[in-house]
């Protein structure tokens, strides 16, 4: 059991026998009223999203999800097929089931992912915290403005756009932090 004040992003709770992922949690306490936790939730089975408010002392059922290592096997339209690395079982997910990690998934990637199961059903996939990708396009370096951290836009092979350091060129391998939408960490050491 968890209380409302213990909710944080990444926590999974059970509501009406469905697993709900806490995507955002904001604790608020005012002088007159009791403390509350404002949350954004996503149903892991249906993909439905909602905003809910819980009291700090509300009791909630937490859910323990099963996790297995998997790799991306292939992409067919909006269907992504992952393979269990231990028993080679294939699992399929639709694009909307993995929308949070979709910008970092590309055909031929070798990253080992974490397949997340609820009652033997694959509900999502988590990528490693840091992944390495190749820059497919970026503009040339800007001359003169080198007093601070100079960033410029870049595009990855799968079309994802992000800001990278000014010295990054086309073809460079970069490290990306996949948490919170993804951000440039630095040049990859290859």
UniProtKB/Swiss-Prot annotation:
Protein name listed in UniProt: Elongation factor P
Chief localisation class: cytoplasm
Gene Ontology MF terms in the entry: translation elongation factor activity
A GO BP entry: peptide biosynthetic process
Subcellular location: Cytoplasm
Family annotation (SUPFAM superfamilies): Nucleic acid-binding proteins, Translation proteins SH3-like domain
GO CC aspect terms: cytoplasm
Role of this protein: Involved in peptide bond synthesis. Stimulates efficient translation and peptide-bond synthesis on native or reconstituted 70S ribosomes in vitro. Probably functions indirectly by altering the affinity of the ribosome for aminoacyl-tRNA, thus increasing their reactivity as acceptors for peptidyl transferase.
NCBIfam families linked: PRK00529.1
Listed pathway(s): Protein biosynthesis; polypeptide chain elongation
Annotated source species: Pseudomonas fluorescens (strain ATCC BAA-477 / NRRL B-23932 / Pf-5)
Family affiliation: Belongs to the elongation factor P family.
Record keywords, A-Z: Cytoplasm, Elongation factor, Protein biosynthesis
InterPro entries xref list: Elong-fact-P_C, NA-bd_OB-fold, Rib_uL2_dom2, Transl_elong_fac_P/YeiP, Transl_elong_KOW-like, Transl_elong_P/YeiP_cen, Transl_elongation_fac_P, Translation_prot_SH3-like_sf
Pfam annotation, one family: Elong-fact-P_C
């Amino acid at each position: 059991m968890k209380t409302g004040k213990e909710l944080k992003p990444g926590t999974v709770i059970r509501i009406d026998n469905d697993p709900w992922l806490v995507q955002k949690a904001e604790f608020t306490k005012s002088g007159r009223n009791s403390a509350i936790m404002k949350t954004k939730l996503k149903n892991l089975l249906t993909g439905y999203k909602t905003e809910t408010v819980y009291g700090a002392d509300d009791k909630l059922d937490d859910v323990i999800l099963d996790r297995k290592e998997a790799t991306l096997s292939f992409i067919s339209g909006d269907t992504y097929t992952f393979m269990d690395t231990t028993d080679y079982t294939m699992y399929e997910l639709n694009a909307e089931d993995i929308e949070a990690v979709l910008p970092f998934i590309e055909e031929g990637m070798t990253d080992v992912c974490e397949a997340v199961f609820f009652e033997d059903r694959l509900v999502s996939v988590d990528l490693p915290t840091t992944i390495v990708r190749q820059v497919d396009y970026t503009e040339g370096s800007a001359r003169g403005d080198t007093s601070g951290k100079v960033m410029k836009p870049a595009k990855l092979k799968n079309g994802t756009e992000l800001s990278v350091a000014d010295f990054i060129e086309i073809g460079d391998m970069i490290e990306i932090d996949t948490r919170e939408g993804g951000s440039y960490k630095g040049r990859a050491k290859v």
